[in-house]
């Protein structure tokens, strides 16, 4: 499993109701234990959680939260989010774009020392784009971006096959 990694992406919520989702890091594939950055548009709040199971409602502890600027909770607008893990330190960066991001949450926790990454949609449409995961032992990709609209799953299989055979 990966450890000491950074994940960054653009995230867009299509509705401004509560519980749209966010991203999870250091996900334990067996137990569901994880860290999660979740968004709450009605209160313009972003929270960093530690959770013990796959269900976001079970066993969560709030490690930090940020309310307000720069999160204005607009619908159909991409925001930039980045989570950095280094040892037990966790940082959450957020902004209207990558070059305008600022550190909004910082926490120390060692409940999870490594794990997978996951997108986390709950009860509303969430769009993710420009995903980048970097860190020790994570292979770099030379990128083979493809517009997914109106593509069959076979297109992704061909890309993967071509990538493996290189």
Model-derived segments and spans:
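Carbohydrate-binding surfaces in secreted/extracellular proteins
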Residues: 9, 73-106, 131
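Flexible glycan-contacting loops in extracellular carbohydrate-active proteins
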Residues: 102-132
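Secretory/extracellular carbohydrate-interaction modules
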Residues: 1-55
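Short acidic, low-complexity intrinsically disordered linear motifs used
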Residues: 146-166
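C-terminal low-complexity, Ser/Thr- and acidic/Pro-rich disordered "stalk" regions positioned immediately N-terminal
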Residues: 134-149
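Surface-exposed loop/edge segments in extracytoplasmic proteins
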Residues: 33, 56-67, 98-106, 141
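Surface-exposed coil/turn segments at beta-strand junctions on protein surfaces, enriched
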Residues: 2, 41, 72-76, 85, ...
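Short, aromatic/His-centered strand-loop micro-motif at the edge of beta-sheets
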Residues: 54-82
């Amino acid at each position: 499993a990966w450890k000491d990694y950074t994940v960054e992406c653009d995230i867009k919520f299509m509705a401004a109701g509560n519980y749209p989702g966010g991203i999870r890091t250091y996900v334990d594939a067996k137990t569901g234990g994880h860290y999660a950055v979740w968004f709450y548009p009605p209160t313009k709040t972003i929270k960093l959680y530690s959770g013990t199971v796959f269900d976001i409602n079970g066993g969560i502890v709030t490690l930090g939260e940020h309310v307000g600027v720069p999160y204005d909770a607009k619908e159909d607008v991409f925001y930039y989010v980045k989570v950095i893990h280094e040892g037990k330190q966790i940082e959450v960066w957020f902004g209207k774009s990558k070059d305008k991001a600022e550190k909004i949450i910082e926490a120390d926790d060692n409940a999870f020392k490594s794990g997978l990454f996951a997108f986390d949609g709950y009860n509303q449409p969430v769009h993710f784009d420009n995903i980048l995961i970097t860190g020790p032992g994570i292979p770099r990709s030379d990128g083979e971006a493809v517009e997914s609209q109106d593509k069959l799953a076979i297109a992704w299989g061909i890309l993967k096959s071509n990538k493996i055979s290189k």
